Amino acid sequence: MKLAQGTVVGLIAGYYDVETATGIVRTRARGVFRQKKQKPAVGDRVEIQIDDKGMSYLVEILPRINRIGRPAVANVSHVLLVISAVEPDFSLELLDRFLTFFSWQKVNVTIYLSKADLISEQRLNEIKESLDYYQKIGYPVFIDYHHLEEKIGDMIKDNQIWTLAGQSGAGKSTLLNHLKKDANQTTGAISTSLNRGKHTTRKVELFKLGHGFLADTPGFSSIDLTPIKLNELCNYFIEFKRASKKCKFRGCQHIKEPGCEVKKLLEEGKILHSRYDDYLAMRTEINEGRMPEYLK
């Protein structure tokens, strides 16, 4: 009997594929997890028990950093956020929702603009101008796929787990197919009736990439921000949080308070107006406790 630690890299019909120092072990979870209403997720760091006959069981889930998405991925350290230039149309509002959600989850984000080759040069330049702002406040931005492919291996550090995210139809599975040639994810055309992609990814797996792992998760076009505390929302806009150190009042919400540094920077054009407008819209959403119908 021996114990080994590893990372859950796949779930298949009740079995868990666990990558250990000596290779991938396919194992089952002990019944105790059902009794405790615990379910191992892809990305979980786990301990498995292997008997003398080679039979193995998952016996412990090690402490998680986080657990996000449906299906869930655990211990996500970084998200590669795929935002489409067209089909579906580029949306700063949607970008801000994703960035706020992942900031709340304490997950770093890199932005990738997909389908840039399907729009005019003029439209691309307009989008680039908007994305320049996000790059300046601290988000890495990639528009050229080949540049992303060249850099991503070095960006994924030792045993980090990255996940793809973005609205349906943005091209996550297509991107994964490029990044991991044997991923064999299905790619689907846009559903014209909804202007959303068909949900073509039906399972979550981790793939070795760089020095860690990349997960593929199903696309989703809306994010529920209502669980965020209203007075904490401003902390998840990274440039607001930095500026708030110069606000006159601690806990400034950047609405009508005197001596607000965020409002000052907004008036000076140093904070994007659309970003501030999205912040106000999110405050209303959280205050009312429901997502706007058009975002569902």
From Swiss-Prot:
Tell me which HAMAP family the record gives.
GTPase_RsgA
Q: EC annotation?
A: 3.6.1.-
Q: How does it assemble?
A: Monomer. Associates with 30S ribosomal subunit, binds 16S rRNA.
Gene Ontology CC, one term: cytoplasm
Please list the residues that bind Zn(2+): 247, 252, 254, 260
- List, for all copies, the residue spans of the domain called CP-type G: 65-223
Q: Name any one Pfam family assigned in the record.
A: RsgA_N
- Name-wise, this protein is Small ribosomal subunit biogenesis GTPase RsgA
Q: How is the cofactor bound?
A: Binds 1 zinc ion per subunit.
Q: Which SUPFAM superfamilies match?
A: Nucleic acid-binding proteins, P-loop containing nucleoside triphosphate hydrolases
Write down the InterPro entries for this protein, in alphabetical order: G_CP_dom, NA-bd_OB-fold, P-loop_NTPase, Ribosome_biogen_GTPase_RsgA, RsgA_GTPase_dom, RsgA_N
- Give the function comment from the record: One of several proteins that assist in the late maturation steps of the functional core of the 30S ribosomal subunit. Helps release RbfA from mature subunits. May play a role in the assembly of ribosomal proteins into the subunit. Circularly permuted GTPase that catalyzes slow GTP hydrolysis, GTPase activity is stimulated by the 30S ribosomal subunit.
| Residues annotated as binding GTP | 114-117, 166-174
Co-factor(s): Zn(2+)
Q: Which family does it belong to?
A: Belongs to the TRAFAC class YlqF/YawG GTPase family. RsgA subfamily.
Q: Which PANTHER family match?
A: SMALL RIBOSOMAL SUBUNIT BIOGENESIS GTPASE RSGA (PTHR32120), SMALL RIBOSOMAL SUBUNIT BIOGENESIS GTPASE RSGA 1, MITOCHONDRIAL-RELATED (PTHR32120:SF11)
Subcellular location field: Cytoplasm
In alphabetical order, the GO MF annotations are:
GTP binding; GTPase activity; metal ion binding; rRNA binding
Task: Please give the biological process terms from Gene Ontology that the record holds.
Answer: ribosomal small subunit biogenesis
Question: Signal peptide: which range, if any?
Answer: none
Q: Keywords for this entry?
A: Cytoplasm, GTP-binding, Hydrolase, Metal-binding, Nucleotide-binding, Ribosome biogenesis, RNA-binding, rRNA-binding, Zinc
